[in-house]
Design a protein with these regions (language model features):
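Phosphate/pyrophosphate- and phosphate-bearing ligand-binding catalytic cores of soluble enzymes
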Residues: 61-181, 185-189, 193-208
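General beta-strand structural signal in soluble alpha/beta enzymes
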Residues: 5-7, 25-30, 69-70
Length: 208
């Protein structure tokens, strides 16, 4: 069944709307921050689910105002990647292919994912979600923790003491420069200790 949404809708709201319609496939997205357009742009995923599994059609507008429509096979969705990171087009509408399911089972799965997130992730503090991509053969949070960087702070930005894979706004007034500086410091120290270069999962646009 096709489920259509404007790209600006919050991903968690789309996940909730799908659940209320007894449609399964988007439960993994219930706690991922950002819009559904952003989720397609980054091929967001969690708990063995990703947008690649449910995306059916994406409509975009280019710099000249032309509308383009892409089918599932044309999206080039990979680990935190889509074709839209390369072609400069803005996503305006998304159609997802979801399956009819049992509403109680869908809700139970979403509740389980929410509880797991709340127990392990610093959801009580502002952040942009998971900060670094998962390097092949490793987990970014584990490498950062083993380097002893939990609690490391640059200005108002801090490596979360709850989950080292998150950079949080610990003081409430962290700047983009603070976050960028902390990301750079973490990259350097992890590389020096483990020989692994971490790459940001967040997109950095412009100068901080």
């Amino acid at each position: 069944m096709l489920f259509r949404s404007g790209a600006g809708a919050l991903l968690k709201d789309v996940s909730e709307a799908a659940a209320q319609s007894s449609l399964t496939g988007l439960e993994f997205a219930c706690g991922i921050p950002g819009s559904i357009g952003g989720a397609i742009f980054m091929n967001a995923g969690a708990y063995d689910g990703e947008m690649k599994n449910v995306a059916d059609t994406v409509r975009t507008v280019d710099r000249e105002g032309n509308i383009h429509t892409y089918s599932r096979d044309e999206l080039d969705l990979g680990y935190r990647h889509s074709r839209f990171q390369d072609n400069g087009e803005a996503i305006v509408e998304v159609e997802l292919c979801l399956e009819p399911g049992d509403s109680k089972a869908i809700r139970a799965k979403m509740d389980d994912f929410t509880q797991r997130r709340e127990s392990k992730q610093p959801l009580e503090m502002p952040s942009a979600g998971s900060t670094f991509k998962r390097p092949k053969g490793y987990f970014a949070g584990t490498l950062i923790q083993e380097t002893g960087l939990k609690g490391l702070q640059v200005g108002g930005a801090q490596v979360s003491t709850k989950h080292a894979g998150f950079v949080v706004n610990a003081t409430g007034n962290a700047t983009a420069a603070d976050v960028r500086g902390l990301i750079h410091e973490v990259q350097q120290r992890v590389y020096e200790k483990h020989g692994v270069m971490l790459h940001p999962e967040v997109r950095i646009i412009g100068d901080a």
